[in-house]
Amino acid sequence: HGKALFLRVLFFVFTVVLRYLCIHTSNRTDMADNYLERKMEEYRNRTAAGQSGRRPLATLGRLLLKNRSHRGYDANFIVREDQLRRIIEVNAKIPSARNQQVLRFRPVLSDEAQKVLAHIRLGGALPHLHLPLPGTEPNAFIIVCSTVEENRYVDIDLGISAQSMLLQAAEIGLNGICIGAFDKERIRQEFGLEWEPLLILAIGRGIEKIELVPIGADGDRNYYRENGTHYVPKVRPEELTIK
């Protein structure tokens, strides 16, 4: 009799738990979908980087190497609002000249991207390529403005901010580029900006193969492309230190 009673109690508990799960499953569908979507994105990021198993630590050295200026992006990958917000939010943690914190940011998602694309220029050293190539345009941007007139302290903040945001983009599996060649007045009009735009960051999933190379004997610092690879000349580490 004791065994039969135990089995009946066990069956009753199982029935209650199953009913509870059935009732709450429908309420959790959206949460589960979002969770699975994020996990799939993390998996794609690891796969694209040739990783397997545990994701390696995002050290500063790795992020700096990954943080290359991409001028071509995967058109099938649409940058989300929360990703841009996460990138912008690093500005609440970084240094600021005189602690003025005068920079403000206008995120631009895919539905407004064309309003930016019409007024920017990429690849100034490769004008014959007319970058970005058709079908590789970025679909998300961050417009950086200042609440005060531009000066040397604002420019210091601008550099710190841009690099910090691009490193954050690299950490979450994205790429970007700083764009200074754009029509400021048209951008300001298109987005009804209260303040003058100083810089634009394009954000997306870069598709270009980019390699760093030492500056040659001729001293040429212009980037160039050969056989599908984008080469960026850099000063040798041993030449950086003043002796």
Regions found by a protein language model. Give the residues of each.
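Acidic, surface-exposed loops and disordered segments
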Residues: L18-K243
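Charged/polar low-complexity intrinsically disordered segments
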Residues: K3-F6, R28
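Hydrophobic alpha-helical signal peptides and transmembrane signal-/tail-anchor segments
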Residues: L5-R19
